[in-house]
Amino acid sequence: SEKTDTLLFLGQDARTKAPTYAIEAIELLQKAGVKFTVLENEPNSGWVYDTLVGATDETKEVMKKAVETLNAYKTVIALDPVDAKTFLREYKEWGLGLKAKVETFTSVAAGLLKKLKPKKSEHKLSFQDPAQLARDLEETEPAREILNACGENCEMLLHGKDTMFGGNLLMNEYMPDTMAKVAADRWVNFEATDAQTLVCASPSEYEVLKMHKPAGKKIVTVAGLLLDACK
């Protein structure tokens, strides 16, 4: 898309395995009048390399290439929490020279609530905290501002920093049975609340939890929730 000062960094999962997640995020920012760029050939953040092999020279080379692209922008909105965590923590700790301001998609979306003016309903919602946001970046409030603006927030027993893993697309490729059990356990937690809809901020967790969704329950993305509330 056209070059602006702001890059929406979709991330590997949203680009290749969770396109709905990417499309809804783009639609929401457009609806709010945000001027931003999406790259046709987005660099790899290096998160997968760091997860699989750690802080190797290869991992750092991948990240350095990403920095060259990211530094062409003043602001980078990281749609996927794994990328946000990698940009804000590993890039900084390893001195990779990232100068662009990095913001999480959830914090940006919460900041747009006054402009979007979602209609609050009595619908009961529960949020799946991604560990990268809640633990690594200590971000828990923006998502709750969004849920409370759209409906009634019903917390699961294990939430915030105590969040429970909801699944992972990379791990689902080589241990699908384990991921099925992980997702099923999280749905059990969800069903212990009064909520009707589970709201996700991670493309990876969204897709795995959706694969194992119990009948009669609903799952949406943060952007999808807001788009529905703004109709």
Describe the role of every protein-language-model region:
Residues 1-231:
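Iron-sulfur cluster-binding electron-transfer modules in prokaryotic oxidoreductases
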